[in-house]
Regions:
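Class I S-adenosyl-L-methionine
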Residues: 1-84, 88
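General small-molecule cofactor/ligand-binding pocket signal
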Residues: 69, 91, 183
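Conserved SAM/SAH-binding loop
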Residues: 92-98
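A short acidic, Gly/Pro-enriched loop at the edge of an enzyme's catalytic core
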Residues: 99-108
């Protein structure tokens, strides 16, 4: 506590319910899946960066051919990520602050979990109506990520089983209506 400002302490405290750091073996498998699918580089987004572990374990051959951007809501891990990856465009802000449809070649993330989705000025009305009862934090990150992928882009999302087998099917129905291939 003595090392943090009141604002930083509040931010760290608020993120304890939705933050989770992805193990290295999982991250390496995420990148292996992208390579298997033929991904060689491009515009990559990590919308829930933490300290940037997913970027840190990116294979060098992909990294050399990529432009990386990311978002981290919590200022402490966001500042760490900025120090570790100075060439990446990392914003210490919520993913809901901007929307860039059809612009990313790959999205690689372990989505945050929670029952309440952020208020996104660009997507809020559409998604709240279409995902009735299933508009939560992890479904928001997945759907927005899919909308930001270019045609032919690849997304690797770590999520809970509730995304695909939860009682409320609205998110699955919306995702299946998008022009994406799910693997």
């Amino acid at each position: 506590r003595p090392l943090l400002t009141d604002e930083e302490f509040g931010s760290a405290q608020a993120s304890t319910l939705s933050s989770h750091y992805t193990p290295e073996t999982v991250i390496r498998n995420m990148w292996s899946a992208l390579e298997y699918l033929g991904f060689k580089g491009g515009k990559i987004l990590e919308p829930a960066m933490g300290v940037g572990n997913i970027i840190g374990f990116m294979p060098e051959k992909i990294s050399r051919r990529s432009r990386i951007s990311g978002y981290e809501l919590d200022s402490i891990p966001g500042r760490i990520a900025k120090q570790l990856y100075p060439d990446a465009n990392i914003k210490i802000a919520g993913y809901e602050t901007e929307f860039h449809p059809n612009t990313k070649d790959a999205i690689v993330t372990n989505v945050p979990f929670g029952q309440i989705a952020p208020i996104d000025p660009a997507l809020d009305k559409t998604l709240r109506n279409k995902l009735k009862g299933a508009y939560n934090l992890h479904n928001y990150f997945i759907v927005k990520g899919l909308l930001e992928l270019k045609p032919g882009g690849v997304g690797v999302f770590i999520t809970s089983s509730a995304t695909m087998d939860g009682r409320n099917s609205k998110a699955r129905e919306y995702i299946s209506g998008l022009e994406v291939d799910l693997i």
